Amino acid sequence: MAHWMEFQVQEEYAQAMRFYRHVVERGGRVILKEIRAPKTKWSSLLEVFEDALVHESEVTRRIHKIGEIAEEEGDRAAQSMLSWFYDERVEEEAQIGEIRDLLKMIGDNLAALLHIDAKLGARVPMSPPPAESTAPQRFLRAIKKRLKSLARFFRQQLRTYVTAS
């Protein structure tokens, strides 16, 4: 699951860069504000994915709000850019929901957990973000730091499950 989450980090980074580039390409200025530190400890893998689904639902709500504002402002370029995100949000929530449901179903079954981990470990990485990115390094570091905490947790939890059996 750590493997899956590491690729999820790359995907989230690429999505953040879509927003960043959209603003910059249209002459806007991105102002970075402090982001509250994410949760770093969970009692189970199920809790990780339950929290992830809540988070993804909140992201979807915020993207829809941006879409409402773009529509009110008649901003066709923003509406066009956001149309990709609407489809992506459905996919994100469905993937995480499916993993959460599988974890609920298997309970403490280590063999099933290892099977799910192997299946998620087959995820193919997306292309890396373009090297010519103009995003400030502080922005990139903040995103990577916050998203990698989930990947570290997965590795730790998997080691705990494997050694406990």
Show where each model-derived region lies.
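Iron-associated oxidoreductase/ferritin-like identity signal
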Residues: 1-165
